[in-house]
């Protein structure tokens, strides 16, 4: 692999990591906003975990999965994932990361 190609690849990988982290942060904030609040523990248990160019948003409270599956006020993470505005904002963060890194 040429030196130039290796440099481009390195920058692209760095941009992907930054973009993924920024996009997941947006998703986490929207999911927390949609989370039903009684004590705040569920909302406070939201975490973003990244590994390389991918990651996840999770709620670690013991009752998070059960609460997510309820009809009333449920699906707070899933619905945030499918929201077109959230998806657009996440995509924009990835685009910005690539634009900044690939100058």
List the predicted regions and their residue ranges:
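Short, Lys/Arg-rich flexible segments
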Residues: 1-103
